[in-house]
Amino acid sequence: MRGTAEMIANLDPSVPLIADADTGFGGSLMVHRTVTEYIRAGVAALHLEDQPITKRCGHLSNKQLVSEEEYLSRIRAAVNARCRSNGDIVLIARTDALQSLGYEEAISRLKGAIELGADVAFLEGVASKEQARQVCEALKPTPVLFNAVPGGVSPDLSVQEAQDLGFRIIIFPGLALEAVSTAVRSAVKQLKETGTQPVRAGSSPRDLFNVVGLQEAVALDHAAGGKLYEKGV
């Protein structure tokens, strides 16, 4: 996870990266290590949740939860890791308690996390616009994050709608994955049925390499007086 986070964070360090830290990958010591490693990787923010290590997607049913005490221990470990590392990583406290334990328990967990030093609250599985507005109001002035998952248990909100309800951060975890999955499925189906692969404008090897930094590599080599690309690419 640290390696992947570091690779993404350093594609463009000027763009802040929010990373999923799941459960912290273990007890308080592992949470401490996870947060420390994410800080060293250049991650700008992470979210930490209250499911057990054998967790499931927040938009599936019958999720299990750890106790509030264990959850807050994770948050405390994350805050301590940030202090010890002299980092400024933003800590997002997530709870999945809404579905099984109800609204009041979920809010209690988030308020406890905020008291310990969490910077942002994340109530997974908000069930309606009314509930969304309610949680944003209940946790003021702490920023609240909305998880935009089309077809999930939460309402489909535009950026403007989410802002109007009081959310201050929105994540779109399936945006790229769903687009890529659909495109790959279509391409493989065409190959299987016709024996040919899709050919689209702007899909040459050079175009792909440009997306992943070919021109930046050329510029860096040229600036250093290198000759790797002097005859072109």
Which residue ranges define each predicted feature?
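Extended, intrinsically disordered, low-complexity segments
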Residues: 177-233
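Alpha/beta enzyme core
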Residues: 1-175, 182, 189, 223-233
